[in-house]
A protein has these predicted regions:
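Catalytic cores of alpha/beta
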Residues: 44-54, 96, 100-116
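Active-site-adjacent beta->alpha loops and helix N-cap segments on the catalytic face
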Residues: 14-32, 45-51, 69-84, 103-106, ...
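Short beta-strand/loop segments at the ligand-binding rim of alpha/beta enzyme cores
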Residues: 29-39, 87-97
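Glycine-enriched alpha-helix->loop->beta-strand junction motifs that scaffold or abut catalytic
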Residues: 4-10, 30-37, 54-60, 112-115
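Active-site beta->alpha loop and helix N-cap motifs at the rims of alpha/beta catalytic domains
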Residues: 1-16, 150-153
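Glycine-rich phosphate-binding active-site loops on the catalytic face of alpha/beta enzymes
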Residues: 11-21, 60-70, 99, 112-131
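Surface-exposed amphipathic alpha-helices with a cationic face
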Residues: 5, 26-30, 83-90, 143-154
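C-terminal helical cap(s) of enzyme catalytic domains, especially alpha/beta-barrels
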Residues: 123-156
């Protein structure tokens, strides 16, 4: 956590640390003033959502679906209900990720979540690029498309 803070990092999404085993991590992130973000899933019981919301700071990551990260053709309908269940127990932002890979999906999620998390779609662009400049252009284009779709969706329009 200290090294991350020294490098300019502000927070970490921790998919592989469970709250019951996070005491050392919580202490380290508190000392380093680093936000820690834990995940809730559609299968999480309400008690677990409360526990995750209490230990997270920065935001709560609502996984749109069960499983591993990666691009998908659609965002699970369970995500909206999970955001609502999480908002019942926290005032922190609730952001949705796992499977968001297109501007249309980002707009859909942006209509009910506080934030949209995109990872694999950007990684795929970088890995598939033939050069660093092509990777940068692809990432910039996707980010701009998602931002525009989110702005339109937040104003009540269609992406």
């Amino acid at each position: 956590a200290k090294e991350l803070a020294a490098a300019g990092g502000a927070g970490v999404i921790t998919p592989d640390i469970i709250p019951e085993e996070a005491d050392a991590w919580v202490s380290a992130t508190d000392d380093a003033l680093i936000d820690r973000v834990f995940l809730v899933a559609p299968s999480s019981p309400q008690e677990r959502i409360e526990q995750v919301a209490q230990i997270s700071n920065g935001f709560v990551y609502a996984a749109s679906t069960m499983g591993v990260t990666g691009t998908r053709t659609s965002v699970s309908v369970d995500a909206r209900a999970l955001v609502a269940r999480t908002r019942e127990v926290t005032s922190q932002p609730v952001c949705v990720g796992l499977g968001v890979s297109t501007p249309e999906q980002a707009a859909e999620v942006g209509r009910y979540a506080d934030g949209v998390i995109v990872g694999s779609a950007f990684v795929r662009l970088v890995l598939d690029a033939e050069s660093p400049s092509q990777a940068a252009a692809g990432v910039a284009e996707l980010a701009a498309g998602m931002a525009a779709a989110l702005r339109t969706a937040r104003r009540g329009g269609q992406a």
